[in-house]
Structures are given as structure tokens and as C-alpha cells.
Amino acid sequence: KKLSLSEKKLLQNKKEDSSFDPTIPGITPPEGHYHIISQTIEEVEQIFKALGFIRRRYPEVETDWYYAEGLNIPKDHPARDDQETFYLKDDVVLTAHTSNGQLREMEKIKTPPIKMINIGKTYRRQASYTHAPMFHQFEGLLIDQDINITHLIGVTNFFAQSYFGPERITRLRPHHFQFTEPSFEVDISCNHCKGTGTINGKPCRICKSGWLELGGAGMVHPQVLKNGGIDPNKYSGFAFGWGIERIAMMKHNLTNNLRDLYSTDINFLSQF
């Protein structure tokens, strides 16, 4: 076989320098993998699928009714302030939460039981090391006869132990949301101090108290059930809404900057 000039040169170099072998195969580039956010979304979906929840995707561009009015949020509520909400028109927004899926799911199913997990992008006019103008949330909704707070506690504990680890527990702390009554903030025991609030006699630098805030939850407000076409005298339910980025950072002990999750730093992203 006749060799090209370049091939002859490579072979000549090989003879002159025994440490150089042009016939050795090159290094194969590493394979890619799911981004940490995509991984987290997949994990959340599978955890709730085990409980019978069905994954839904509802609009990111939403009307005022599904975004606010139908969820018991009046026109003068601070959450409606255009300093936080992206208004495209007077009655059309980039939804700031995944709770818009509640009414849409009620209208779609019509007759309970309803078990929905709505995972999607949300938008708010905020930007800092702990907040981003675009982030992901997941909204859970369960409606049936005789649903009560103990069912909510069971679901939150199941999620916490499935995602964060079997030793983690949750607690409900009274709060206020327009679309749930009663309403709670869900806290999860801190993994760093094992829920004690202290390490070597000093306050835990992560939680300071033994607990970390997971997100909001509560029993669906009767008026919201009515707005969705569900009889509140016959059915009850609970809902919860938590951040994908937040739980990912909590699981992987990322305490510095939310924006790192959307960086192009391969060394950082390849850890997950």
C-alpha cells in the first residue's frame, strides 16, 4: 500500500521518538448525562408515580382566572403586584406558580378521585443568589372523599424519605395561603445536624434550628373546590407546591448560589 506524505512523516517520527506512537487510539470523550434539574424532575415524578399520582403539564402562559382569581387570590393581593409577576396583557401572565394546574385538573377530571403532580417552569421578577426569574416547581393535588391532614402528612413524609433518605422526617408549621385552609409550611429535618440544631455545642450553620423549609401545603380551600366544579360538601383534598431547584440544592448540600445550577461549568455540573 502506498503511504501518503503525512503517514510517512508520522512513521518517521515514531522511529525517531519511541515515546510517540501515532497508532495508539485517541482518548474517547466522556459521555454526557442528565442535567441535575432534569434528574430531579425525573426523581420527583417517579416518587409520586409510586403513590398513584399522574404527571401533568399545564400552561406557562396563563389567564388571570387560573393563575389567581380562581385560586382565591383577589385583585388587590400583593402576589398580583406587577413588580413580581410578568404580565403579558392585563389578564395574561407568565405563571408564577404551578398552582394554576389545580383548577385545570379539576375541570379536566370533573369527578374525583384526583391525584395530580404538575411539574413545570415558573416565572417571577426576582434575581439574586437564592432566586431566579425562571425556576421549576411541582404541584401536588389530591381530592377525594374524607381526605384530611393525616393523608397530607403521610405523603410529605413518603416524599421526604424517598428523595432525601429514610432517616428524614417532616413537620407542618401553621402558615397562610389564599387557596388552602388550613395552610402550612412543610419543614424537613436537617441532614447536617441530624435534626438537633447543634453541632459540637454550636448552632448548625445550615439550619440553626434542626429544620429546613421545604415548601407550602394545605387543605384545598372550599371556594377553590367550587371554582373547579367540585362539591366541597362531598369532597376534600390537599395541595402542596415545592421548588425543584430548592430540593436539589438541599439534597446535594449546595448552600451557595442557585445560579450555579444554570452555569456552564462542566466541572461543577459533572458532579451530579
PLM regions and their residue ranges:
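TRNA-recognition modules of translation machinery and tRNA-sensing kinases, especially anticodon-binding
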Residues: 1-272
